[in-house]
Amino acid sequence: MKTLWKVLKIVFVSLAALVLLVSVSVFIYHHFQLNKEAALLKGKGTVVDVDGKKMNVYQEGSGKDTFVFMSGSGIAAPAYEMKGLYSKFSKENKIAVVDRAGYGYSEVSHDDRDIDTVLEQTRKALMKSGNKPPYILMPHSISGIEAMYWAQKYPKEIKAIIAMDIGLPQQYVTYKLSGVDRLKVRGFHLLTSIGFHRFIPSAVYNPEVIRQSFLTDEEKEIYKAINFKQFFNADMEHELLQSYQNGSKSVNLPAPKETPVLILDAVSDQNRHSKYAIQNRKDYEAFAAQFNTADIKELRGTHSIYLYQPDQIYKLSMEFMRKVR
């Protein structure tokens, strides 16, 4: 028996030493690569100080309306990933892409990502970069919480919301992260902080961005570099862990019924008849019913719909804005 325990102890210590050695090696390699890639990160936008932290806002175009593009969770380089869409809007309008804390060229804030903090940072970044309200918000995924909360707290600042396959505030409340999911989020952050994500690039950035041609070859390399640097950092981790509390804050306020809302529902062919797609459509319909002016349009494609249907999104958005003006 003593011999067995001795063998098990040796095996355990050996495995622990191997894991430590691999982790240290990956960490060193990751930071070596970060130092090499730093030369690529020359900036894209206007960097402003928000509560002692640097935040980046990219803007282009001119016109009466300002469309604010708000990325989903983990979209580490939104000014690059969403270029294929916002470049269509900027031909006749002003656009702004806000890098939330921990995204793009913005610094990691290391706060708990409470929705009030997130919203005030976004508002200050826009104002300090010369983008004054009212805005037409273009949220994607988890940014749906911030967009709706913004319209609830500052309705005069929001001209309309064009929601790209967003997560509704009440969905983050109804489908609260389980204890196991929260452990997965924390574990994933730990692995990425060491640098293991380097070995699964398809999980770090969207290969579709590289496949398409709206970025130059140089921009594609910058896009990759930002993703490797920022992917699933502390702010992105806390953003997910805080989603239930943030959704609850919005749910507990009256719906901003005067705000015109266009919901773009991304539905892929293979998931069209799935329980998720059917329930999501019902959720969207119930949500839209709370507004004086609201419409839902179904688009063929997966969640990152701005990559697959940019022309259709632009067309539907312009039609909707002409209708509500």
Curated annotation (Swiss-Prot):
The lineage of its organism: Bacteria, Bacillati, Bacillota, Bacilli, Bacillales. One of its GO terms (cellular component) is plasma membrane. Its main location: membrane. It is a single-pass membrane protein. Residues 94-166 form the AB hydrolase-1 domain. It comes from Bacillus subtilis (strain 168). Gene3D superfamilies: alpha/beta hydrolase (3.40.50.1820). This is Uncharacterized protein YbdG. It comes from the Bacteria. InterPro entries: AB_hydrolase_1 (IPR000073), AB_hydrolase_fold (IPR029058). The gene is ybdG.
